[in-house]
Amino acid sequence: MPVLAALLRRGPLLQRRVQEIRYAERSYVSKPTLNEVVIVSAIRTPIGSFLGSLSSLPATKLGSIAIQGAIEKAGIPKEEVKEAYMGNVLQGGEGQAPTRQAVLGAGLPISTPCTTINKVCASGMKAIMMASQNLMCGHQDVMVAGGMESMSNVPYVMNRGATPYGGVKLEDLIVKDGLTDVYNKIHMGNCAENTAKKLNITREEQDTYALNSYTRSKAAWEAGRFGNEVVPVTITVKGKPDVVVKEDEEYKRVDFSKIPKLKTVFQRENGTVTAANASTLNDGAAAVVLMTADAAKRLNVKPLARIAAFADAAVEPIDFPLAPAYAVPKVLKDAGLKKEDITMWEVNEAFSVVVLANIKMLEMDPQKVNINGGAVSLGHPIGMSGARIVVHLAHALKQGEYGLASICNGGGGASAMLIQKL
């Protein structure tokens, strides 16, 4: 202080210089480094087929079940959850603030702030990423994040205005808001066909990949590899016994002999994408409880995994299937890792061609990619899927191993997240 006082007596120029030094050294954050963020529980519902076993439940109810299951698995009081983010794409007809409905339905305090995230198919993962950022910065210390979708309950709509002579045309919001490239006015499946052509990926390769996805999913269920991540869903039917759904529904509904014979859906001439080698319309929800490492110590909770890195990327809208190949290198660079350091890859199977394209572009080992199947065989509730693949990695990895999940989204985007099992 005597030195500063002496400097201040030497005139205005030195006084200004001292003020600049003080300003530069001033800190506006409680910690100079980011908090470490850990996953302490990771839960999902079974995935229901379109108009299938879970179709009587709205997305918000499925979200409540996943959130409640995750908090119970974490073994913490609900009051400890300071905020919640959930991904949800097809919100038409769900009512105000879907995440708020899901959170209050799970029994969390009325004071819990809630936000719904819509990044199309990457919504569930983006919710986890944004919650992680909140925790890293110290804005909160315990959060819930995930994704939910009930494609079975998405309504049809018609334009407002006078009814014209000849009637009105109803639009399916699944197609309009979830599966259409608004820039090129084409279905996501046509974008997938464009990718297949660009990278010379054949119908036969896609069919083989789809068969492998179904085979892997069946083997994983039979070996109990999904058991720790799935919470049963009880369906109450008036006048009948309750129905308990414990397993994914979609992977059982396949006839392998029909796959090579199916007609292409989006491009009749020289097309490659069929109903079998694309993902299906589905219902489900997934949630994780995230907290800072300090909060985990305070609550005496043993983490499953830590959030190591995450990133987004964007390309031309028609090339959305390729976008993960641009997000993944960002994640690896941020984490200081190489591809060889990754034990398991999850690349969301929106279409078989998506995974095949990213394996080719990133030169990944196919034996490490979606080793327990993916959306082609398990199903693709679009707001849930990004969270589901993170949930699966949190359980499937062994201690010390790294897993990298990536998912493309309509509009030319992708999100990717790296976790390390603890």
From Swiss-Prot:
Residues 1-28 form a transit peptide. It is found in: Mitochondrion. GO terms for molecular function: acetyl-CoA C-acetyltransferase activity; metal ion binding. The modification N6-succinyllysine is found at residues 61, 73, 169, 176, 185, 197, 218, 238, 240, 258, 261, 263. The active site is at residues 121, 408. GO terms for cellular component: mitochondrion. It comes from the Eukaryota. It is an enzyme of class 2 (transferase). Activated by potassium ions, but not sodium ions. The record marks 380 as: Increases nucleophilicity of active site Cys. The modification N6-acetyllysine is found at residues 61, 169, 176, 185, 197, 218, 240, 246, 252, 258, 333. GO terms for biological process: fatty acid beta-oxidation. CDD domains: thiolase. Its main location: mitochondrion. K(+) binds at residues 214, 275-276, 278, 376. It catalyses: 2 acetyl-CoA = acetoacetyl-CoA + CoA; propanoyl-CoA + acetyl-CoA = 2-methyl-3-oxobutanoyl-CoA + CoA. Its EC number is 2.3.1.9. SUPFAM superfamilies: Thiolase-like (SSF53901). Keywords: Acetylation, Acyltransferase, Fatty acid metabolism, Lipid metabolism, Metal-binding, Mitochondrion, Potassium, Transferase, Transit peptide. Pathway: Lipid metabolism; fatty acid beta-oxidation. Succinylation at Lys-263, adjacent to a coenzyme A binding site. Desuccinylated by SIRT5. Homotetramer. This is one of the enzymes that catalyzes the last step of the mitochondrial beta-oxidation pathway, an aerobic process breaking down fatty acids into acetyl-CoA. Using free coenzyme A/CoA, catalyzes the thiolytic cleavage of medium- to long-chain 3-oxoacyl-CoAs into acetyl-CoA and a fatty acyl-CoA shortened by two carbon atoms. The activity of the enzyme is reversible and it can also catalyze the condensation of two acetyl-CoA molecules into acetoacetyl-CoA. Thereby, it plays a major role in ketone body metabolism. Belongs to the thiolase-like superfamily. Thiolase family. This is Acetyl-CoA acetyltransferase, mitochondrial. It comes from Bos taurus (Bovine). The lineage of its organism: Eukaryota, Metazoa, Chordata, Craniata, Vertebrata.
